[in-house]
Amino acid sequence: GKEGIGSGQHIVFVTGEEYYRSEEGMSMFAKILSQRYGYDCTVLFATDKTTGIINPNISTYIPGLKALVKADLMVIFARFRELPDADMKHIVDYVNEGKPVVGIRNATHAFRYVKNKQSPYAEWTFNSSKWRGGFGQQILGDTWVSHYGKFLQEATLAHANAKHRSHPVMQGVPDKIFCRTDVNGVNKLTPNENVLFHAQVLSGLN
């Protein structure tokens, strides 16, 4: 990255989902953070191992996860990944070190083990009973529960929660944000979780 407040800090973006073009959005986000604020950014993609072409529909391969060894922050925007143990270990080791994690959208269900249920990391699956709720519930606060609103049919208007308007994350953020997606439901919030926005599901996508 260029000179800026983020100089010397390394952010690794882990992408891989089929609906929201995380491979595009996170690349643009990383460029902003790198060029305007000085962060060193690495963006990793779901990739076809045979062709080397980025393909979010490939759920079993995200090359370059070793970059997490020297990461200061992991941003994960992924859905239903089932990675080889050697690759998944980098994510697990990073989290187990207690380093910060930002999960976006379907990161609550970033992992789903279907083929290799004997993997030592199968408990990270979104509906795990052994490690209740897997990565989503244990690390991000909740796993995937349901869609709130009709999936791919209804949009959302997010309203800032006045109670937390002074939260550092909310600096420069407008009071209302329109999203051309529905939202995900949660079962229960813990006392340690702060709701920064409340979602209002709209009729239609406009």
Set out the residue ranges of the language-model regions:
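Short linear motifs at secondary-structure transitions and domain/linker junctions
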Residues: 17-19, 48-53, 77, 132-136, ...
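Catalytic beta-strand/loop cores that center a nucleophilic Ser/Cys/Thr
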Residues: 34, 40, 58-59, 69-70, ...
